């Protein structure tokens, strides 16, 4: 295994799995997106829509009650389970046959939510993507890393990463700190940036797609949904991270001639995913 690898189209083709012509939505996998709080339901809309647009057969959103109408109207393809609380998640409780879970988008850090997240981590064994406020809660309770399932995928931007590992003086030191956590807990980190890097306990991967258009609100929520979808489709976690990051960046490259940088928004990532997939399989 190489210690460093650039993610280009050939690397993606080696990992991409064509969809069987006899498949059905059950085989395409059921993904759960857990998140949302009052005023931040857009994050769940983006993540869950990206999740189903990326190929998951079924997607359910677990959200506080205040978000039910928002998600059902915005993404009619996505099912909804609501928490008993109106404005934040206080108990994560569901009975579903799932293949993957993404948690954290727009979730907030209410004490009730932190307690619910802890109890969820103690019982969850499914492939997991951890983003946004779930990362921030982890950074305040670093010992909870030991509760994560093997190959859990953490998707921090630079500030979220700093809260998790502390400050660094160079890129080399940053990667070394991340690598230590990967080795200790068998994790995968998606270090969002320019370029985005993916780190596990064996290798570091550098993405080659994307541009400055991705520096927009909700871009990370969409990425979390894409990776959660690929996990639901039974991709190995490292391949889900690699393909997800590549597709996410590729949408910005494809859209640039039409919308430029400034006018590109997170919803454009979702709308361009079909073209990105076609670029891979052409």
Curated annotation (Swiss-Prot):
Keyword DNA damage: no
Keyword Disulfide bond: no
EC class: lyase
Biological processes per GO annotation: metabolite repair; nicotinamide nucleotide metabolic process
Documented EC number(s): 4.2.1.136
Domain of life: Bacteria
Catalysis: reaction(s): (6S)-NADHX + ADP = AMP + phosphate + NADH + H(+); (6S)-NADPHX + ADP = AMP + phosphate + NADPH + H(+)
Signal sequence range: none
Cofactor(s) this protein requires: Mg(2+)
Molecular-function annotations in GO: ADP-dependent NAD(P)H-hydrate dehydratase activity; ATP binding; NAD(P)HX epimerase activity
Residues at which (6S)-NADPHX binds: 106, 157, 221
Keywords from the named record: ATP-binding, Lyase, NAD, NADP, Nucleotide-binding
Sites where the protein binds AMP: 220
Start and end residues of each YjeF C-terminal domain: 8-280
InterPro entries: Carbohydrate_kinase_pred_CS, CARKD, Ribokinase-like
NCBIfam families (UniProt xref): yjeF_cterm (TIGR00196)
Similarity comment: family membership: Belongs to the NnrD/CARKD family.
Functional description taken from the UniProt entry: Catalyzes the dehydration of the S-form of NAD(P)HX at the expense of ADP, which is converted to AMP. Together with NAD(P)HX epimerase, which catalyzes the epimerization of the S- and R-forms, the enzyme allows the repair of both epimers of NAD(P)HX, a damaged form of NAD(P)H that is a result of enzymatic or heat-dependent hydration.
Subunit structure: Homotetramer.
Listed name of the protein: ADP-dependent (S)-NAD(P)H-hydrate dehydratase
Organism in which the protein naturally occurs: Flavobacterium psychrophilum (strain ATCC 49511 / DSM 21280 / CIP 103535 / JIP02/86)
